């Protein structure tokens, strides 16, 4: 199988980060990476572009790490309260979504709903949760569900 060198323009899971030079199958590059704008073909003249991308990625990583540390300080150990409709037995009509938790956290810090880890919430009570703010930084908090 033929392999080709490509330069990633965006982070691709299980492959690399922006600015990395990686070897991939020619079909994967031609049919997925190039059309999606995730990579371009490697050339000797592209070394300057690689250096610029790596510099930009490093600067962004430092900024996002500092933002994540500030967000962790605001979120860590807090409790967010969410009101929901409940039956007489105390069970929720539906459940509490990660989007609802992210909205409740929005006054403390902006978080990605996909980064929130919490067990399935189907009753009222307190539930431990975690949010990944950065690959190295997570914050723990509690979700309190009360009857509406």
Swiss-Prot record:
Tree of life domain: Bacteria
Signal sequence extent: none
Name this protein carries in UniProt: Large ribosomal subunit protein bL9
Keyword annotations of the record: Ribonucleoprotein, Ribosomal protein, RNA-binding, rRNA-binding
Function per UniProt: Binds to the 23S rRNA.
One BP annotation, GO: translation
Cross-referenced PROSITE patterns: RIBOSOMAL_L9
NCBIfam families: L9
Name of the gene encoding the protein in the UniProt record: rplI
Gene Ontology MF: a single term: rRNA binding
Keyword Hydrolase tagged: no
Alphabetized InterPro entries for the sequence: Ribosomal_bL9, Ribosomal_bL9/RNase_H1_N, Ribosomal_bL9_bac/chp, Ribosomal_bL9_C, Ribosomal_bL9_C_sf, Ribosomal_bL9_N, Ribosomal_bL9_N_sf
Family matches, as HAMAP family: Ribosomal_bL9
Record's keyword annotation contains Aminoacyl-tRNA synthetase: no
Family statement: Belongs to the bacterial ribosomal protein bL9 family.
Disulfide-linked positions: none
Record PANTHER family: 50S RIBOSOMAL PROTEIN L9
Gene Ontology CC: ribonucleoprotein complex; ribosome
